Amino acid sequence: MLTYINAGHNPPLMICSNTLLQLTTGGIGVGMLPEIPRIREGVVHVSPQTLLLCYTDGLVEQKNDEGEDFGMDRLIQIILQSDASEMKKLNTSIILSLDKFKQDMSYVDDIALFSCKFL
């Protein structure tokens, strides 16, 4: 079992047997209000070989020359179509796809990407 809290960030993604789950349970972002009104914990079952991918908004909000966002749908498609046997290969596939997508646009926000596989 994995217990988590999402504090207003992009939802981490869990992938198991080509089933994708967005980890959205949590609350408002830390520091957004003087007091946090409510925090909920999420609990999910984690099977062996489950992937967890965490990323910052700079990844999915990166624009290309046409002003189009990279977006969640594109990220999910890349994850499901990639060789996820090794996290380094998955991360490289995502970053190369983003670099190709953005064309000549500069990066305007930080991008962080973390992935792991539960054994």
Stretch-by-stretch model annotation:
Residues M1-L119:
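Conserved subregion of the PPM/PP2C metallophosphatase catalytic domain
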